[in-house]
Amino acid sequence: MIAIRSLIPVLLVLGLADVCRAAEATESSALAVLASGAGVHEKARACQQLAVVGGPATVPALAALLDQEPLADYARSGLEAIKDPVAGEALRKALVRLNGRLLAGVVNSLGVRRETAAVPDLRRLALDPKSGVASEALASLGMIGTGEATKPLRTVLGDGPAELRVPAAHAALAAAAQLAKDGNLVDARELLGCVVRALPSGHLTTAAQRRITALRADPAPAVPK
């Protein structure tokens, strides 16, 4: 029994090594498919595989597809899932060469990743009426939910275009939840107050007011170290 127990760590290490080698092989195979003359279905499947096993080496191949239909969404989803910061950088760089639906998708992915480095770019898009993705940029700023990310939300709620105030309110509710989770209760309440003041009475203002009341009653949560 003792001998068997002593083998367990060795077996675990060997098993982990096998898993890593398999992942590397899958990544290499998927990248080879993207570089080949394979069909759309095969390349889409390769993008999906890279979302699971891809690392920094995967990023250039996926980034090159962000403006190419019908693979752009598959490539974007792959980059969205890769944890390495270079994936977020690739998405940010793509903002200047995309428009329409493809631009909106990348904006959304930056929010899902909570890319704080993208806040200046998202702010520009949110406050530019000609960007075509102002609502999407506001939503992503809400998902990021840092103090800096909430500044454009406050701007729109304060004196922004009327058609953007509802999207900004939705984003502010999401951002307030993140601020509260991070222990920034005062900032969360102030942001929710902006929602209450910006809109006529309705479900969004009711939700904001209820959350303000709840935050006043809740003790400050411990901020994760």
What is the meaning of each model-derived region?
Residues 1-4:
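N-terminal secretory signal peptides that target proteins for export/translocation
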Residues 6-18:
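Bacterial N-terminal signal peptides
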Residues 20-25:
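Boundary at the C-terminal end of the N-terminal hydrophobic targeting segment
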Residues 31-34:
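Acidic, Ser/Thr- and Gly/Pro-rich intrinsically disordered linkers and low-complexity segments
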Residues 36, 41-55, 64, 72-85, ...:
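Structural detector for internal amphipathic alpha-helices that build alpha-solenoid repeat scaffolds
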